[in-house]
Amino acid sequence: MSEPLGAWLRGVGLWSLGYPSFPAWVDAGMPEDLDPAGDQAPGKPSADLLHPRLRRRTSLLTRMIVTALAEAAGQGGAAHEQTRYIVVSSWGEIETTVDLLRQLAVPGGPISPTAFHNSVHNTATGYLSIASGNHWPSTALAAGPHALEIGLLEALAGLRAAEGPADALLILAEERLPAPFTRADADPSFALALHLARAPGRATHPSSLDLRIELRDSPSASAELVALDTLPSLVRTIQPLLRAIAAGSGHAAIALAQQLDAPPNRAGVERTWTLHLHES
Amino acid sequence: MPGRLPITAYSACNGLGTTTEAVLDSLFAGRRGLVHVAEEYGVSTWIGEVPGPLPALSAALSSFESRQARIAQLVTLPMLDAIEQTKRRWGAGRVALILGTSTAGIAESERAWIHQRDHASLPAGFAIERQHALHATVEVVRALTGVRGPGYVVSTACSSSGKVFASARRLIEAGIVDAALVGGVDSLCQMTLRGFAGLEVLSAEPCRPFSSERRGINIGEGAALLLVERGRHPSQGEFDHLGVELLGVGESSDAHHMTAPHPEGTGARMAMQRAIEAAGLEPSDIDQINVHGTGTSMNDATESRAIRDLFGPERSQGDLALVATKGYTGHMLGAAGATEAVFVLASIQRSLLPAGVGCDPIDASLGVHVNQTLRARASQRVLSNSLAFGGSNVSVLLGASE
């Protein structure tokens, strides 16, 4: 890379069944498990950005994404109609998809048109653009164990391109794999939103984090190894980044992807990146 | 100003054939690649199905078994020599792998769901991350090619494999990679056939884009891959390519409705406009458009409106050549954008416009003229549109090398 890709991290949002915001997770001692602790009841994402008429048709995934995104955008001051949305998820709208599999198992049976159009990977970005009148391009990606790295590459390369908006909201989100595809190693339901921008925001939004981030090629980055036949965990991948944001000071260098362990049938990647995060 | 990115190789398979040669021969001979759907789907329509038994996966890839993976392998193997050259030119880690898909291997999960209902367990060997996951298609192509740069899937329904060109262009311009293997892979499944039937847009007959007798869409499967590269190597200078370059890409969101396009074609117009601007050109520089042209009354009306608004009523019925190809392949959904980019590329290389099968009689109320018969035409700059659920639009601009 000629010069490192960089941006300002202005806001963060987190929503999981156990923690309804980033501060709630920090206050709880930054637990690795994002599900409710002990006998705590699971929360419900408010997804206030969506009109109730739209909201009632949406899945947990879409509501989590909208809720986390509103938190990040509010902190750093992202205008919803002037932002590029990037969603990265391995399973996407998996609850809606599995409900459709149940409908499809009945030969000749009816298929819900709403469930069908809500099963696409870009469902959340579609609803978000409708709710905010946003005509900028958005995208929905899947990158397996490289979700965080790929999301940052897309977001930062997009901010650098002349033709896009000056703000990006990067969202990493999963719904827990439902039956019959349940897996002990699957990620819990959660959404993480990061507001990334060409310029810092504190001048107009005092709560803006204004952490400078840079992506650097690092061939030797010691990414965590994932055993074959184990699902890579996005929740584990994002932990160092969440902790560095919570610390909010000094300098942190974060490896971005999990590597699959010695895979006989999975060719590895050669490029790895480290995310450098520091105070302005 | 962003550079022009030459295309060095391409490959396609779909209802027209299993090899690029067979696909393009059929396209320029005006032969449809559609067949009546098998009874098991419980719907009456025509589909574009990759013909014949698909070759088995190589032993190393057997755990990825799925129709999706077999189609991915079929389209990738003819590209291996070209990919080796690209890897040698830039380094395997400097080549990205960006694929569009909407279905991925969902057909395998359809069978798995029924298996667990009947046997209280998933089928032996079924792993959701290899049979069904979007990302599995990238792993299959990565394993076959040894491309080692960033690899991911864009899944924005029917615009997926048009938007891969935008991602590739951004990564190359940001200096992250020097080349990208881009494309799309989609495979037939109950989900899309019966889902679109539920939306009441499936045509019981071969589809008729832009015809006054259009009755909806046909679903197709298949794949296309293209190698896009930085124009000039710092030490080796220029290198051999196909004489066609990626000039620009435009993307937009309708911000209107999950399934219905904006009635005024706003998003489609913005996508075309942004592609033209990204290339530093004017609408008057464009001489051909491969339309999205699904054959639904709504798509064709709003896309026509967008074209008329951007290029003017005269050019839309005059010297602007409009080509609709879904009558050949059906709507290949997540593979449509890359497939139609290959059609555009072949059209520029051969200086030929393919005939518009099924487009006759043209719906005069649309105010645009779609090409109907095979004819000679030396187009220099061609847009290819893909418009999707969620209001996700993309227009890819390809041009002859100057």
Identify the residue ranges that each predicted region occupies.
Chain B
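Conserved small-residue
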Residues: 9, 27, 79, 97, ...
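ACP-dependent fatty acid/polyketide chain-elongation machinery
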Residues: 1-64, 101, 231-245, 342-357, ...
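Active-site-proximal alpha-helical scaffold in enzymes
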Residues: 80, 134, 142-145, 150-183, ...
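Acyl-CoA/ACP chain-elongation machinery
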Residues: 176-198, 203-214, 249-263, 291-301, ...
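Condensing-enzyme catalytic core mediating Claisen C-C bond formation in acyl metabolism
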Residues: 4-8, 13, 25-46, 206-279, ...
